[in-house]
Amino acid sequence: MEERTRAYLRGRFGDHYRQASVTPPPAANEREWGFIPWTEGPGETMVRHRSLLDLGEIEDFLGRRKPRHVYFSAGRYDEPSASTMSDKGWRSSDLVFDLDADHLPSVVLGEDSYAEMLAKCKDALRRLLDFLEDDFGFDDLTIVFSGGRGYHVHVRDERIRHLERDARREVVDYVRGIGLEFDELVDEESVAGTAGRSSPAQKRTLSTEGGWSARAHRHMLAVVDDLLAMEEADALEQLQEYDGIGEGKATAALNAARSNYEQLEAGNIDVHPAFYQLAKILLHEVVAADNAPIDEPVTTDTNRLIRLPGSLHGGSGLEVQRIDRDDLDAFDPLVDPVPETFRGHDITVEVTDGGLVELDGDSFTLEAGNQTVPEHVGVFLMARGRAEKGKE
């Protein structure tokens, strides 16, 4: 990044911060703070181990220092400005989740556009919220667009604030479906008669109420619905695509599903041994489709620094923005986080990496060279290293 570009961005970030209202997190004075300034050279240098007392009022600090990135800790401490973690005196930590489009299995880097990556990340966010709200029963959630390629979720429920790393890793494993075994999801009870199996009879069911068991049940029923809507030959052919399912088992599983649909709806998967085997195989699809691929180190690290909502992301010029739960569906990460400071006027930039830019409801295909663009587009390009500031 050239000095002209760096000075321009730093100045405009400062203009934004002098007008912005930034709300600090709860217990802000108990947290460590860090920031990355606009420094020369290709790398970035983190300034950390600061307390709010060191920084002063957060809005004054932002307007004065005009930082490139701003962070606060998930952890709360006795001495947040101590230079070593052992001297800080850990009290508790928020449970923080990070979804980054770069790490999603569904994202094809180099092929998916920025908009497509963010759309896939929003789908993953919905799955994460399903786990947090329905499975864990958390309602004190703060949802944040990171300003870059993903989302953060902060849980500040008193019940989890004192969890240590191993317990937090169990939460990670649960939402990612790591180590999930089908037999753990199945309720088994002895019943009179054969229950579709040879005696002694055991009735094995998937819960329809919640958790991974209910997800497995919903997916199983969706597959059954698709199979029953097909021509029989097509359904049998599809069933035989699963490992271990030959023609005989495919026929038996399909007939059992057709004859016992109401039992399947109720969760009974013991309608036939072949169908039980199919249900077990489908678990792999359930985990792939329904897990939340969060960044594990962020959640397990009780000392993690995370972006400050209301600050600007120095790699995009977009605002790190809180999202009300009820507004999530309507939230557009390419429109809503565009700062008002950068709207309404054009600037000149020297584009070095042309291509598509989708921002603030518009789409631009830019070639390399001098270009006059809306300022929010120019800031985005410069922050991402795709342009330098041109002469006006």
Swiss-Prot record:
* GO MF annotations, alphabetized: DNA-directed RNA polymerase activity; metal ion binding
What biological-process GO terms show up in the record? Answer: DNA replication, synthesis of primer
Keyword annotations = DNA replication, DNA-directed RNA polymerase, Magnesium, Manganese, Metal-binding, Nucleotidyltransferase, Primosome, Transcription, Transferase
Which Pfam families does the record cross-reference, listed alphabetically? Answer: DNA_primase_S
InterPro entries named among the record's database cross-references:
DNA_primase_S, DNA_primase_ssu_euk/arc, DNA_primase_ssu_PriS
Q: Name one GO cellular component term.
A: primosome complex
Protein EC? 2.7.7.-
Name the active site residues. Answer: 98, 100, 295
Which cofactors?
Mg(2+); Mn(2+)
Record note on quaternary structure: Heterodimer of a small subunit (PriS) and a large subunit (PriL).
Cross-referenced NCBIfam families:
primase_sml, PRK00419.1-1
Q: So what family is this one in? A: Belongs to the eukaryotic-type primase small subunit family.
Describe its function. Catalytic subunit of DNA primase, an RNA polymerase that catalyzes the synthesis of short RNA molecules used as primers for DNA polymerase during DNA replication. The small subunit contains the primase catalytic core and has DNA synthesis activity on its own. Binding to the large subunit stabilizes and modulates the activity, increasing the rate of DNA synthesis while decreasing the length of the DNA fragments, and conferring RNA synthesis capability. The DNA polymerase activity may enable DNA primase to also catalyze primer extension after primer synthesis. May also play a role in DNA repair.
Q: Name the chain's protein.
A: DNA primase small subunit PriS
- The species this protein belongs to is Haloarcula marismortui (strain ATCC 43049 / DSM 3752 / JCM 8966 / VKM B-1809)
